[in-house]
Amino acid sequence: MSDRVNTTRLQEMARAYTVSAVLYAALDVGLFTHVSNGCVKEADLANATGLRRIDIDRLVSCALSLDLLDWDGEELRNQADVEAYLVEGKERYAGPWMMFTRPDVPGWFEMTERMRTPKSSRLGMYDDLTVESARQYHKATSSLSLIHI
């Protein structure tokens, strides 16, 4: 073990939002579902997702670097947890839960400003809960109940 101090951990924190962004983009275009359904080459994924080839290359490269995807010879495949939980139509699909807090992201980047306001910030979603947002919340949390099946 090295006692050398470096910035690696801090850099990972500073760029952690990119991990969420890649996951959201992959779910937006159904990347993992397409791979599971046999689109295992980038050209096929570009056609299936409607993304430009350069952008599917970028998304796949990011997903590979995050261990969401892997290579099986010349073909892409989902990692086991991705296959189990992020393929739409599968029994344990947890996509709604993964995406549920996405609207909260901008608020986290306003954290400093919110803490500096004279009025205390509200925590939680319940003050602004609508019938539609309650339905989305129920859909998201019910997808969680399937995870342990």
Segments (PLM) and residue ranges:
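Short N-terminal amphipathic alpha-helix/helix-capping patch enriched in small hydrophobics
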Residues: 27-28, 41
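Short, Lys/Arg-enriched N-terminal segment that forms or immediately precedes the first helix
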Residues: 6-20
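Short acidic, hydrophobic short linear motifs in intrinsically disordered regions
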Residues: 38-48
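Conserved Class I S-adenosyl-L-methionine-dependent methyltransferase catalytic core
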Residues: 13-17, 25-26, 33-34, 54-146
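Basic/polar N-terminal segments that are highly enriched at the extreme N-terminus
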Residues: 1-5
